[in-house]
A protein has these predicted regions:
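Flexible glycine/proline-rich, aromatic-decorated loop/lid segments
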Residues: 176-192, 402, 406
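N-terminal helical capping/dimerization or prosegment-like subdomains
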Residues: 1-76, 306, 323
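A short core secondary-structure module
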Residues: 204-226
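Active-site metal-coordination/substrate-binding segment of hydrolases
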Residues: 59-132
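A generic structural motif
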Residues: 105, 195-197, 313-321, 350
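Acidic, glycine-rich active-site loops and adjacent beta-strand->loop/helix elements
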Residues: 68-70, 134-143, 165-170, 193-195, ...
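Acidic/histidine-rich catalytic neighborhood of metal-dependent amide-processing enzymes
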Residues: 103-180
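An extended, acidic, His-containing surface patch that forms the Zn2+-binding/catalytic region
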Residues: 57, 171-172, 229-306, 317-327, ...
Length: 414
């Protein structure tokens, strides 16, 4: 619980010391496990924690990647308890009890699971391979400094397979291995109208309201079939074959249970695709936050000077996040009326990734699941993004096994 108690929110500067504390605690755990070459590797941002246990150069080497930073917890009033005060509660899904805290699944809990596994194997003297750990503190803000670290430390990070547990599985009783991740493009739009907030009675109807304008612009980003309207957005999308689509839709999935679990009244998404397809093999564009004007309690009749929106786009194979950034920026500027000015800011992003299923690593992971669950895991594609995965394959020339244990009920990022 000690690691979960640290509010290592990488997105907020006021938590920089906490992020550092999490890195230092992780290093202590590495040393306690008797890992070798344990170190905190400095970057221009938050550090990377490294440790290894090399038994023999003749044995294969697994590189375990994870992250110790977490998402912001806002809005705090929607939490039942302090998100950084972990506790165990029995639930319908987990009658044995589950840990509740920010990061319990994403990714402190899943990452720490590997440390405990190594601990047991070292105690029993049956560690069957070499193991390296590379745990970063910036995954939730795009892994901006990990790319340079990987490029500068290829020999240190050399491996036969990369193991990542930062994804999920279908259910507690149905194991799955993630074979694909969507990419990400994260943008911010700022509109400016008048040079200050105005009296909505004196100026309403005569001055363009940036919030009204931004709302119309955002609404225009999808057509009536929920397809994204940015010119060129779908140009390089690699379509999934009908055979693969049919196989994908054989995955155990109940739409009514899906809706009930998150309080939906009706389905939503791009016409012509199932919910499973919409959340994995199709791109998506969503507003992550929108604000402007007066948003505190009570009333203040203003016509705001500015309006803001943060928008993320999930990408699929064939799309390049930097190209999508360019298309988005150009389109937003083209549809901005002359009554306001616009500023578009690029944040982080990453490429989509598809993993092969014919590797030794995949076979080993599949066998491990089968040994525990007495059934073969199902290969699935995940709608989320881990920006650095595609880079691993490019720079380290090794494949990644996305062996996650998270469940939808974990409500990560909520």
């Amino acid at each position: 619980f000690e690691l979960l108690r640290i509010p290592s929110v990488s997105a907020k500067p006021e938590h920089d010391r906490d992020v550092r504390s999490a890195a230092e605690l992780l290093k202590k755990h590495f040393i306690k496990l008797d890992l070798d070459n344990c170190e905190i590797c400095e970057t221009k941002g938050h550090p990377i924690v490294y440790g290894e246990k090399i038994i023999s150069k003749d044995l294969p080497t697994i590189l375990v990647y994870g992250h110790y930073d977490v998402q912001p917890v806002d809005p705090l009033n929607l939490w039942d308890q302090d998100p950084f005060n972990p506790y165990i509660k029995k639930t319908e899904i987990h009658p044995e009890g589950a840990i509740f805290a920010r990061g319990a699944c994403d990714d402190k809990g899943q990452m720490f699971m590997h440390l405990k596994a190594i601990e047991v194997m070292l105690e029993n003297g049956d560690l069957p391979c070499n193991v390296k750990f590379m745990i970063e503190g910036e995954e939730e803000v795009g892994s901006d400094n990990l790319e340079l670290f990987v490029k500068e430390n290829k020999e240190k990070l050399s491996n036969d397979i990369i193991l990542v547990s930062d994804t999920g599985m279908i259910s507690k009783t149905i194991p799955s291995i993630t074979t694909g991740l969507r990419g990400l493009s994260y943008m911010e739009v700022e509109l400016t109208g008048p040079n200050r907030d105005l009296h909505s009675g004196h100026y309403g109807g005569t001055v363009a309201n940036p919030i009204n304008v931004l709302s119309k612009m955002i609404n225009s980003l999808h057509d009536s079939n929920n397809k994204i309207t940015i010119p060129g957005f779908y140009d390089n999308v690699i379509e999934v074959s009908e055979e693969d689509r049919k196989e994908m839709n054989l995955t155990p999935f109940n739409i009514d249970e899906f809706k009930d679990s998150i309080g939906l009244i009706a389905e939503h998404g791009e016409a012509g695709y199932s919910t499973i397809e919409r959340q994995s093999i199709r791109p998506a564009l969503d507003v992550n936050g929108i604000w402007g004007g007066y948003i505190e309690e009570g009333a203040k009749t203003v016509l705001p000077s500015k309006a803001f929106a943060k928008i993320s786009m999930r990408l699929v194979p064939g799309q390049n996040w930097k190209r999508i950034n360019e298309l988005f920026t150009k389109h937003i500027k083209n549809i901005t009326p002359k009554t306001v000015s616009v500023k578009v800011t690029e944040h982080h992003g990453g490429q989509p990734y598809v993993a092969p299923t014919d590797t030794i690593g995949f076979e080993a992971a599949s066998k491990a699941y089968e040994d525990v669950f007495s059934k073969k895991p199902i290969a699935t594609r995940d709608g989320g993004s881990i920006p650095i995965i595609a880079l691993f394959e490019q720079e380290l020339e090794s494949k990644t096994i996305l062996m996650g244990f998270g469940l939808d009920s974990d409500a990560i990022h909520s």
